[in-house]
Amino acid sequence: MDRFSLYVPNFLPKAEYFGKGHTACMGCGLALGVRLVYKVIGEKINKGKWEVPWKLGIFGVKTESAEAKGTSLLNINKGNGVKGKITICFDYEGINNLEVIKKHIPSLAVAEDFDYVGTASVGYPFDLIDKVKTGMESKGNSFLHILCPCPTNWGFDPDSTVKAGRLAVESNAYPLYEVVKGFYRVTVEIPKPRKVEDYIRLQGRFKKTGEEDIKQISQTVAKEFQKIKERV
């Protein structure tokens, strides 16, 4: 058993609002992301509005057909005297998402003048939980973008979901940061980043990706991360 599995469950909030009986696949990153968010939101989830293009069975939504678009949105009015709402984007990406490294969704949220914008990964649950709390408690509208690795679509072992979520962050392919009224702050610093190739090679969906493509993706990662650092 790794240290993550051994220690993390002991320090997470004990309350559970994400019950059994859903149809999520084994190792589903989306289900893990929803579970962590529910631990913070609690009973307020009853006031939430889902916009779910896929994985409908997880949320008890019945439909005849659903297209795997790669994202699900949850909108919740904050309440308790706090004006505004929080929008949470659970991003499990597409099967052949060659633009996996170029995450423009948080930038779009900043451009839309959200008062609080944050990125999170199921591989870093405490950072995720802290950002949900901040998003719920801060004044104005909040937006949280959560990376939820999908074993089925991405092509990795179901027991590697957390590993995929951590590698995304540790390689700077998916940096964790927050933007409060236009001010940037990196919330998880990686002193010695992993190779982007380690993150890519974990995923079967990129098995045909060549060395030259990986080199270009690595350069893109470096450039995008540098942009964020310059804004801090």
Regions found by a protein language model. Give the residues of each.
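Conserved thiamine diphosphate
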Residues: 12-14, 21, 100-138
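Flexible, low-complexity linker and terminal segments
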Residues: 150-232
